[in-house]
Swiss-Prot record:
Single Gene Ontology BP annotation: L-proline biosynthetic process
Role summary: Catalyzes the NADPH-dependent reduction of L-glutamate 5-phosphate into L-glutamate 5-semialdehyde and phosphate. The product spontaneously undergoes cyclization to form 1-pyrroline-5-carboxylate.
HAMAP family: ProA
UniProt KW keywords: Amino-acid biosynthesis, Cytoplasm, NADP, Oxidoreductase, Proline biosynthesis
Superkingdom assignment: Bacteria
The protein, known as: Gamma-glutamyl phosphate reductase
Biochemical pathway: Amino-acid biosynthesis; L-proline biosynthesis; L-glutamate 5-semialdehyde from L-glutamate: step 2/2
Enzyme class per UniProt: oxidoreductase
CDD domains from the UniProt entry: ALDH_F18-19_ProA-GPR
Pfam families assigned to the protein according to its UniProt record, in alphabetical order: Aldedh
Family affiliation: Belongs to the gamma-glutamyl phosphate reductase family.
Species for this entry: Alkalilimnicola ehrlichii (strain ATCC BAA-1101 / DSM 17681 / MLHE-1)
Lineage: Bacteria, Pseudomonadati, Pseudomonadota, Gammaproteobacteria, Chromatiales
NCBIfam families reported for this sequence: PRK00197.1, proA
């Protein structure tokens, strides 16, 4: 069986590599036509998608899948239309492929510049949400790449139905159907093969729980674009506008609880703590957020649960917030350096010199001033859809959109130039 899986995955890899060469040559018009055709196919086959999805939902209920996962798994008319519109929006985005920058003459007379080109073959491993099949395929195609998609077994039928629409759209536009391939087996050995296919796969993007991403990172020989945790911080400086600070800190925690850009730890300068924490605590309680605090915090909020050492390094993804009162900016930056996952941090301040220092010294993929961490999102950043968020420093960092799925090569223009 292992040999069969290896042979199957090698076939997918070879087909993807061949398709990637064709996609790299495809012009913007053909890629956009494919995206529109894919969107049309999703809406035309909405009935087929819902029937396939019903099988997945039935299996999920039989296997006692968590209600939240069942909700993510469900496809209805609204979500199918949303997927289709997402593809059309990606078609409307600028095509990064072929863009040339920094073209300049050198003393030798040659011109040297950089051209943006596709990465090649992208392996995407994800869980639960079948819409990722369409989103990931579209981003890979618009950026001139081929994709091998391995979704969760709980969405097997839905993913296959969406992939059929994607391939139909590619073929309508005259592009290779093998540019997007879905791993059809549920055997986990297929993932083990995919993450080690260096000869065919250029980069992996895992999307899912921490356990999945840790496994991929530990076992892959192919480079990985990923983030493990979203331990995001908001620091309220003593120069902050109290009303503004309360509003932002409340939004950063409560606007949506289970996302990687939700604030998990609130740091407050001791000089402003009495002016913001009682009101902020009241608002958190109204939203049924559990408060965990240091000793100084609990003197202002007596019903707060004592925070443990582990709380400062925990991504709750739940209605829980840790609060620590610190002497000032130095201690806030030090706390973030020790406990942050490198995702997103924000300072609330009216002192621009402190804001600039925070921007310069905090080493995370997104650093903000007077804004909610919930803005750390490809759409909000003007990137359009994103394939994920990277907290690594190589190759991409922060929300990864179309440009993050490309790289650069040097181009040199001459006219018979030789090196003396």
């Amino acid at each position: 069986m292992t040999e069969d899986i290896r042979a199957y995955m090698q076939t997918l890899g070879r087909q993807a590599r061949e398709a990637a060469r064709e996609m790299a040559r495809a012009d913007t018009g053909h890629k956009n036509a494919a995206l529109h055709a894919m969107a049309d196919a999703l809406e035309e086959h909405a009935g087929d998608l819902k029937r396939a999805n019903a099988d997945d939902l039935e299996n999920g209920r039989a296997n006692n899948l968590d209600p939240a996962l069942l909700d993510r798994l469900e496809l209805n008319d609204e979500r199918i239309h949303g997927m289709a519109e997402g593809l059309r929006q990606i078609a409307a985005l600028p095509d990064p492929v072929g863009a040339i920058r920094d073209l300049a003459f050198r003393p030798s007379g040659i011109q040297v510049g950089r051209m943006r080109v596709p990465l090649g073959v992208i392996g995407i491993i994800y869980e639960s949400r079948p819409n990722v099949t369409a989103d990931a395929a579209a981003l890979c195609l618009k950026s001139g790449n081929a994709a091998i998609l391995r979704g969760g077994s709980e969405a097997r039928h839905s993913n296959a139905a969406i992939a059929a629409c994607v391939r139909a759209g590619l073929k309508r536009a005259g592009l290779p159907g093998e540019a997007v391939q879905v791993v059809e087996t549920t055997d986990r050995a297929a993932v083990g093969e995919l993450i080690r296919m260096d000869e065919y796969v250029d980069v992996l993007v895992p999307r899912g729980g921490k356990g999945l991403i840790e496994r991929i990172t530990a076992e892959a020989t192919v480079p990985v674009i990923k983030h493990l945790d979203g331990i995001c911080h908001v620091y309220i400086d003593d120069s902050a506008d109290p009303a503004k600070a309360i509003s932002v800190a409340y939004n950063a925690k409560t606007q949506r609880l289970g996302t990687c850009n939700t604030m998990e730890t609130l740091l407050v300068a001791e000089a402003i703590a009495e002016r913001v924490l009682p009101e902020l605590a009241r608002r958190y309680r109204e939203s049924e957020v559990e408060l965990r605090g240091c000793e100084a915090t609990r003197r202002l909020i007596p019903d707060a649960v004592p925070a443990t050492k582990e709380d400062w390094s925990t991504e709750y993804l739940d209605a829980i917030v840790s609060i620590r009162i610190v002497p000032g900016l130095d201690e806030a930056i030090e706390h973030i350096a020790r406990h942050s996952s490198g995702h997103t941090e924000s300072i609330l301040t009216e002192d621009w010199s402190r804001a600039r220092r925070f921007l310069r010294e905090v080493d995370s993929s997104s650093v903000m001033v007077n804004a909610s961490t919930r803005f750390a999102d490809g759409f909000e950043y003007g990137l359009g859809a994103e394939i994920g968020i990277s907290t690594d420093k190589l190759h991409a960092r922060g929300p990864v959109g179309l440009e993050g799925l490309t790289t650069e090569k040097f181009i040199v223009l001459g006219d018979g130039h030789i090196r003396e």
